[in-house]
Amino acid sequence: MTQSQGQDPRLDTSRTIRAPHGTTLRAKSWLTEAPLRMLMNNLDPDVAEHPHALVVYGGIGRAARNWACFDKIVEVLERLEDDQTLLVQSGKPVGVFPTHKNAPRVLIANSNLVPHWANWEHFNELDKQGLMMYGQMTAGSWIYIGSQGIVQGTYETFVAVAKKHFAGEAKGRWVLTGGLGGMGGAQPLAATMAGFSMIAVECDESRIDYRLRTGYVDKKATTLDEALAIVKESDTPVSVGLLGNAADVFAELVERNITPDIVTDQTSAHDPLNGYLPQGWSMAYAAEMRQQDESAVVKAAKQSMAVQVKAMLALQTRGAATLDYGNNIRQMALEEGVENAFDFPGFVPAYIRPLFCEGIGPFRWAALSGDPEDIYKTDQKVKELIPDNPHLHNWLDMARERIQFQGLPARICWVGLKDRERLGQAFNEMVKNGELKAPIVIGRDHLDSGSVASPNRETEGMMDGSDAVSDWPLLNALLNTAGGATWVSLHHGGGVGMGFSQHSGMVICCDGTEDASARIARVLHNDPATGVMRHADAGYDIAKQCAAQQGLDLPMLNEELSKLK
């Protein structure tokens, strides 16, 4: 570390990490080269929010606990054999054990706490002592692909909002939101893709500038009047990054009787200490206060969140389609006395759950070669294999035209149980026959149909009341391990913060081998099938129909399913 960084082992401004490209391996096989490259890709300065501090996205979502741990993980992956498995505990490599060639090469557990102690206060104490790391969802599981990772899900949500509230017509309408970080930064592009204009309030000017450079936001404004004028005067959908405090701007719109068509938020409200700037505070003052009085920061942040949520509720009563986009801001406001904070819905029960019932979710893949042509070829293969889905084809065309790759070229594409395995097998065959220059890794967000328990987000309002049952993501992780995913992760607190979620992830490497084909057959079937199982078990008819069509064996439901075939 450089001298100026003092004692913080997580900060090193001298380091610049980029994933290797091409076909020369640093590790002993592609099965260990894959996690090595994707770990490094998470910390590429074109990908990560604060790479020098190992922060990938989502407040303090890290890829490794500290730089010594990062270096040791790299060292181990370079020497790991194909019958060994590396264990990673909250970003720290803690053991290498003998397994077998079809076992995962890496097993990861991040941020998990015994429920009674599963809160930010206890986590932050452990974090300060170097005993824990916040892994968010795809930060600590090494499958973050930049803002593209959530663009399609956000796009699908905005399209669904247009259908539900505006008869499918987005023209001339605009969205108000907050936050342009790693997740929130996807919102402006998703909105304009769906035909809406957007004003996105962000307190960190560097984030607005970054989204401008990468094409995720169109314009920058420093006053609300300027932002409103840009939206009003544009004949086509336009996105504006507005420098300001979300609570201030949302409240000002209420006071001025200006009502957006859609209102949402993607600030890092899940982490009141590190993720939300209190009203009246500068970025520098907030950083100083985090060192001096953490409780004061948390209190001030949550008070400001309450102001913002009250404004969102007021805009809802005036006709705005208002939705929570999964950052737990409603819960924070509720704890500050806003008793009706949950009067506006979360985006999953309102718009996404029917997709989850069919195992449809954020399937993603990355080209380990580093060559964009590998992604373009896989885009075409998806179109060939799913020829009768013009909506999906339109997404792929828009993605190629409008989304800049960050780090290793990658693609996000929402597909479900009936398609994931087929696509994985096709990609593996393309590697085998040389159509692609190097292997592909396939993963997903932890925000998926069967891999998360999050009562204020993905599992909000389950029809059987099982919102908080977290057996499901644990079973998902166990099954993906048994099936032979290349690496598997089990996390706590992603998206909505400590105490509010448990979730699992998997990544599988398509290296062109027959062994990979067998693993793909298991993993890319079983993984989405757990989502169909979970929703069928909760009573959703769409999930039961999908389970019957796909021949799932669900012992307590098989008699009912047999009548649906």
UniProtKB/Swiss-Prot annotation:
Catalytic activity as recorded in UniProt: 4-imidazolone-5-propanoate = trans-urocanate + H2O
One GO cellular component term noted in the UniProt record for this chain: cytoplasm
UniProt cross-references to Gene3D superfamilies, sorted A to Z: Urocanase like domains, Urocanase superfamily
Binding site for NAD(+): 58-59, 136, 182-184, 202, 207, 245-246, 266-270, 276-277, 325, 495
Cytoplasm recorded as keyword: yes
Location(s), subcellular: Cytoplasm
Domain of life of the organism encoding this protein: Bacteria
Alphabetized SUPFAM superfamilies for the sequence: Urocanase
Top-level enzyme category: lyase
Molecular function terms, GO-annotated: urocanate hydratase activity
Subcellular location, principal: cytoplasm
Pathway annotation from the record: Amino-acid degradation; L-histidine degradation into L-glutamate; N-formimidoyl-L-glutamate from L-histidine: step 2/3
One GO term (biological process): L-histidine catabolic process to glutamate and formate
General function of this protein: Catalyzes the conversion of urocanate to 4-imidazolone-5-propionate.
Listed name of the protein: Urocanate hydratase
Phylogenetic lineage: Bacteria, Pseudomonadati, Pseudomonadota, Gammaproteobacteria, Vibrionales
Name of the coding gene: hutU
